[in-house]
């Protein structure tokens, strides 16, 4: 199976859902990380080198949008979103199209994550039979996660080692701490958030979650709740429609945000 991961920024490939990507990789699936941007122009060379090394360590194929999309707070977000749609569409329509798309939720608070999430949504909605979409959240929350990936300390160390390649970003904000802390917290909360309150706890020290949505007969349906089976990761979706949530305005549009 070919997995397309969409990164608004370099380092998102190792912060959004890294344990899930690595579990899929280890099961023999081919993971491609599409980096939409390289941050501010002055940082392009550094961040290109960092994401190249990070993907080498993680054993992900890397594709970088050329030229990188400008999606910082002061940039033209409409243009950025249009370019993101075009780039994702090109990846979808290539000689080897993906069987699964993974990327940010359109409600992930950070403007660049949200525009990338909307771009994924819009591109998939134009396809007759698009692949499933697994959404992660870094700055926001997933109100109804559907899929849990559990992992151990060894996997956590592997994620940290790959994320350490993003030297400049880790010096600014150490997301290795973020990923570790989130994994420990999610191991406690995931079972009840995915399977219902009162569900037994996971037998794991670390976990991460994504929300799966599947486009069927012109409607978005929520994925089936489950623990990831990397060898057979896809499943028939539920009959629960989630298009109203996917298409709803971001809370940023209602109350603003720290970058507005």
Residue locations for each model-derived region?
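The feature marks non-catalytic terminal segments
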Residues: 54-58, 129-260
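Active-site beta-strand->loop->alpha-helix modules in alpha/beta enzyme cores, enriched
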Residues: 1-132, 222-226, 231-260
């Amino acid at each position: 199976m070919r997995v397309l991961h969409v990164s608004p920024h370099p380092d998102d490939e190792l912060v959004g859902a890294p344990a899930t990507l690595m579990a899929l990789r280890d099961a023999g699936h081919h993971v491609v990380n599409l980096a939409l941007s390289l941050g501010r122009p002055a940082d392009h060379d550094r961040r290109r080198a960092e994401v190249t090394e990070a993907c080498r360590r993680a054993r992900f194929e890397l594709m970088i949008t050329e030229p990188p999309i400008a999606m910082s707070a002061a940039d033209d977000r409409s243009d950025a979103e249009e370019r993101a749609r075009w780039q994702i569409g090109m990846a979808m329509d290539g000689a080897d199209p993906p069987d699964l798309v993974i990327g940010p939720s359109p409600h992930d608070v950070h403007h660049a994550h949200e525009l990338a999430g909307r771009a994924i949504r819009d591109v998939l909605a134009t396809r007759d039979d698009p692949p499933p979409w697994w959404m992660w959240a870094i700055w926001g929350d997933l109100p109804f996660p559907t899929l849990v990936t559990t992992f151990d300390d060894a996997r956590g160390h592997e994620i940290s080692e790959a994320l350490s390649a993003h030297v400049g970003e880790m010096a600014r904000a150490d997301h290795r701490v973020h990923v570790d802390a989130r994994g420990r917290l999610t191991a406690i909360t995931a079972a009840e958030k995915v399977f219902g309150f009162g569900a037994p706890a996971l037998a794991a020290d670390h976990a991460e979650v994504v929300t799966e949505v599947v486009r069927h007969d012109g409607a978005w349906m929520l994925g089936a709740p489950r623990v990831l089976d990397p060898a057979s990761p896809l499943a028939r979706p539920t009959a629960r429609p989630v298009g109203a949530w996917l298409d709803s305005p971001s809370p940023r549009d209602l109350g603003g945000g720290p970058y507005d």
